């Protein structure tokens, strides 16, 4: 990509938002200081842009990252270090890893698996996971949004203590592969915390801002951001030039990170302990919490030392756990997970249409990228290229979020920055035959607004159902239903005549709004896809993309079959309407010819009734049979009138049907 393309993109953005900018100038709000928050699975971080640079704000313990822990005791609620420090004594009432629950369904396979390893109780409310704790002796349930809000509230307090003023606006990060429900839930958590979330920004994009903000020179650079944190994994390819950050592709796994590596270590030592003592500690919550902390600490030490020792006094049933863990053993326990992270790396390169050699920098983000084997695997994959460790792995995401906050407040040094992010999955509606008709293809820059005109499937149809789907397959049955609504009040008309404009609008946070309007009557309905809709689990997203690749030929054949059927059916009804119009051809056609056509139409409709599941070739053959009968008659009529010989329905609208 050269400078002229970047300049054109910037110009288009300026033109698109010029009117809105004028209006905003009149009613411009004073946001005050807009903070950037990295709401992490295991740790969170907050920063602010001021005086031309980003400041990462330490908490009251002097630490620049804060554990994403919330605990409830008999007398108080604890957040951060204080909550984590008492976790082994109060495991049932200490909440962590809440990011792995936010925006998910209770029956999600990954939620069910996590429940077996988490010491606190999780219950279902309308198929959403809620945590159950004892608060001052009474049992209470909290949604993941509420727990997340407590952590966000703590980060807000940390910022306010440093800035000496109230903070009301923030930019919050989330994994690039978070779906709509997870993004909406993250925004909701901000509202609960008393923050207006101006933007939900993708974590690898934020990290790229951190990397590129101080970069000198205007030469185009392609970077791959490899973001492996405590609970989630993202990888994105971006092109950076002249302050424009363009996301080219993104992929990841919202349920893969350092916590999974810890769990492998925990399972290993539970097995070792049972073999040596004959005692099973896997169901004891206090023992598990002790082991979880020891495993996390061992993992950290092994990033710089070849071995370490776990020492847990009175681990279970009066027995101590004292064992050695080598780096080699740690790598053996997790090698399949380490290698699993390379699959999304391959996918983003493929989606961006880049070769390995076209990536100028591989930027490491997230605490888990400190693991030497991870760094070695990436170096080998990129043919010996050393990964870039120039950004702070724990702080880069909050840094980028703070830069975005600075853009909102027009801070010095941010005026030339332009960020172009993308939609992670294709969005569309169902049309006749169960076809997925895409309005926003995967990889489209956001924010975006796309409209398309559709029509009715039956004569005098007074309402249509708009069903919204997300996924990569060509048939809706293989994709995920996000929501649906009906548009009624359509004036009676022949099929294919009404014009129904469907508009998809995705905002900068990746949240979707859909509307439909009948152009004749002005009747309009809309829906915002929000967190209360049943949404995808990460497994669903991964399955969709994989199945779409595996079943591309099958998808193509199914779509072609439906299109062939629709073409035949439309042709039949166009002919029927044409010969029935007495003011035009219907009034000029000879009775014998009309009878011939009516018989052919009747035969074709009867064949369709019996053979609705026929193959594409059979529908094509029926079309040719009908055309062979009808075409000579219409050609004769149009020839006599000096008109077009192409006959039936040449003035009929040609829209996909709902």
UniProtKB/Swiss-Prot annotation:
GO terms for cellular component: cytoplasm; endoplasmic reticulum chaperone complex; endoplasmic reticulum lumen; lipid droplet; membrane; nucleus; phagocytic vesicle. GO terms for molecular function: ATP binding; ATP hydrolysis activity; ATP-dependent protein folding chaperone; heat shock protein binding; protein folding chaperone. It is found in: Endoplasmic reticulum lumen. SUPFAM superfamilies: Actin-like ATPase domain (SSF53067), Heat shock protein 70kD (HSP70), C-terminal subdomain (SSF100934), Heat shock protein 70kD (HSP70), peptide-binding domain (SSF100920). Glycans are attached at residue 611. Its main location: endoplasmic reticulum. Disulfide bonds: none annotated. Pfam families: HSP70 (PF00012). InterPro entries: ATPase_NBD (IPR043129), BIP_NBD (IPR042050), Heat_shock_70_CS (IPR018181), HSP70_C_sf (IPR029048), HSP70_peptide-bd_sf (IPR029047), Hsp_70_fam (IPR013126). Belongs to the heat shock protein 70 family. This is Luminal-binding protein 2. The gene is bip2.
């Amino acid at each position: 990509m050269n400078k002229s393309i970047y300049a054109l993109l910037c110009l288009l953005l300026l033109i698109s938002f010029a009117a809105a900018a004028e209006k905003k100038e009149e009613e411009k709000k004073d946001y005050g200081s807009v903070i950037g928050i990295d709401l992490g699975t295991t740790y969170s971080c907050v920063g602010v842009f001021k005086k031309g640079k980003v400041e990462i704000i330490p908490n009251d313990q002097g630490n620049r990252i804060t554990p994403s822990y919330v605990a409830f005791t008999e007398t108080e609620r604890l957040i951060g270090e204080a909550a984590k420090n008492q976790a082994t004594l109060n495991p049932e009432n200490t909440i962590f890893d809440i990011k792995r629950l936010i925006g998910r369904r209770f029956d999600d396979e990954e939620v069910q698996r996590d429940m077996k390893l988490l010491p606190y109780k999780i219950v279902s409310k309308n198929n959403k996971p809620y945590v159950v704790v004892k608060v001052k002796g009474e049992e209470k349930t909290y949604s993941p949004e509420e727990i997340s809000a407590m952590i966000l509230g703590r980060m807000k307090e940390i910022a306010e203590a440093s800035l000496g003023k109230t903070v009301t606006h923030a930019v919050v990060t989330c994994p690039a592969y978070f779906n709509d429900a997870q993004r909406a839930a993250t925004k909701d958590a901000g509202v609960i915390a008393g923050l207006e979330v101006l933007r939900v920004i993708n974590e690898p994009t934020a990290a790229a801002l951190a990397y590129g903000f101080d970069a000198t020179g205007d030469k185009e650079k392609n970077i791959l951001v490899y973001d492996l944190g405590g609970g989630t994994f993202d990888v994105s390819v971006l092109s950076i030039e002249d302050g424009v950050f363009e996301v080219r592709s993104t992929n990841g796994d919202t349920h893969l990170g350092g916590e999974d590596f810890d769990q492998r270590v925990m399972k290993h030592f539970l097995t070792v302990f049972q073999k040596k003592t004959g005692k099973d500690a896997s169901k004891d919550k206090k023992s598990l919490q002790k082991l979880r902390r020891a495993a996390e600490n061992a993992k950290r030490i092994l990033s710089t030392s070849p071995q370490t020792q776990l020492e847990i006094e009175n681990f279970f049933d009066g027995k101590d756990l004292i064992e050695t863990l080598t780096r080699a053993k740690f790598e053996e326990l997790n090698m399949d997970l380490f290698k699993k992270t390379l699959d999304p790396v391959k996918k983003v390169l493929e989606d961006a249409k880049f070769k390995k050699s076209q990536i100028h920098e591989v930027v490491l983000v997230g605490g888990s990228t400190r693991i030497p084997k991870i760094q070695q695997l990436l170096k080998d994959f990129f043919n010996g290229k050393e990964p870039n460790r120039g950004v702070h792995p724990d702080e880069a995401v909050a840094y980028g979020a703070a830069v975005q906050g600075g853009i909102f407040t027009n801070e010095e040094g941010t005026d030339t920055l332009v960020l172009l992010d993308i939609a992670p999955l294709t969005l569309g509606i169902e049309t006749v035959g169960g076809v997925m008709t895409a309005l926003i293809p995967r990889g489209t820059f956001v924010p975006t607004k796309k409209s398309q005109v559709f029509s009715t499937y039956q004569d005098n149809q007074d309402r249509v159902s708009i069903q919204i789907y997300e996924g990569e397959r060509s048939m809706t049955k293989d994709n995920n239903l996000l929501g649906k609504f009906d548009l009624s009040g359509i004036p009676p008309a022949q099929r294919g005549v009404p014009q129904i404009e469907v508009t998809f609008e995705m905002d900068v946070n990746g949240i979707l709004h859909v509307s439909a309007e009948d152009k004749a009557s002005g009747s309009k309905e809309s829906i915002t896809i929000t967190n209360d809709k049943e949404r995808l689990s990460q497994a669903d997203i991964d399955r969709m993309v994989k199945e779409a690749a595996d079943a591309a030929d099958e998808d193509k054949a199914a779509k072609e079959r439906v299109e062939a059927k629709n073409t035949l059916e439309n042709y039949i009804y166009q002919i029927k309407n044409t010969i029935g119009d007495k003011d035009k051809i219907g009034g000029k056609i000879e009775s014998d010819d009309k009878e011939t056509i009516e018989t052919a139409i009747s035969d074709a409709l009867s064949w369709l009734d019996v053979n609705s599941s026929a193959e594409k070739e059979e529908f094509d053959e029926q079309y040719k049979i009908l055309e062979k009968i009808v075409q000579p008659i219409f050609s004769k009529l149009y020839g006599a009138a000096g008109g077009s010989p192409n006959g039936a329905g040449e003035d009929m609208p040609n829209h996909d049907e709902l």
